[in-house]
Amino acid sequence: MARSFYSHIREAWKTPKEGKLAELQWQRQQEWRDQGAIERIERPTRLDKARSLGYKAKQGVVVARVSVRKGTARKQRFKAGRRSKRQGVNKITRRKNLQRIAEERSGRKFRNLRVLNSYWVGEDGSQKWFEVILLDPEHGAIQNDDDLSWICDDSQRGRAYRGRTSAGQRGRGQQKRGKGTEHTRPSIRANDKRGK
């Protein structure tokens, strides 16, 4: 049976550090390091992944590449007194994953757009790159699209900041059900933060 064009792309991205893709990624990342933290791009780097998440090559659909530094939170040492438990500086981690942070930053950069989804495109020793798909809820091409028009509803405003994207739901424990998820619904906070 003949394989589709997208299946070959998907196969290559399963092992991005091997084969022809490894050299291509090495060249790309040299360019990405010189660019800004948030760059609007013409077309997705991973076309198969972007299309599976809802991307369409049409007006009103924007893709942005976002870089986020790796590592734990950079916490300043307190000048005033604290009890020992509250004095922590090292090993303090974020409560959000880096992908969710990338989505939020792109949402703040493009304020008139709404975040649809995002995916990983690369990383080096100090940062990770994600590509974020954003939609214009006021554009007629989006409003008349049967697959994408749902994002025009007012309930989808600020969805990246409220953990409504896939990365946000993953961080809130919403992608699992049943045993072990007793403290994740309706939210982490409603269960006195016992879900994390």
Swiss-Prot record:
Highest taxon of source: Archaea
Gene3D superfamilies: Ribosomal protein l15e
InterPro entries, alphabetized: Rbsml_eL15_core_dom_sf (IPR024794), Ribosomal_eL15 (IPR000439), Ribosomal_eL15_arc (IPR020926), Ribosomal_eL15_CS (IPR020925), Ribosomal_uL23/eL15/eS24_sf (IPR012678)
GO cellular component: cytosolic large ribosomal subunit
Bias type Basic and acidic residues, positions: 179-196
UniProt keywords, alphabetically: Ribonucleoprotein, Ribosomal protein
GO MF entries: RNA binding; structural constituent of ribosome
GO BP term (any one): cytoplasmic translation
A Pfam match: Ribosomal_L15e
Record family assignment: Belongs to the eukaryotic ribosomal protein eL15 family.
HAMAP family: Ribosomal_eL15 (MF_00256)
This protein's name: Large ribosomal subunit protein eL15
Organism from which the protein derives: Natronomonas pharaonis (strain ATCC 35678 / DSM 2160 / CIP 103997 / JCM 8858 / NBRC 14720 / NCIMB 2260 / Gabara)
Upper classification of the organism: Archaea, Methanobacteriati, Methanobacteriota, Stenosarchaea group, Halobacteria
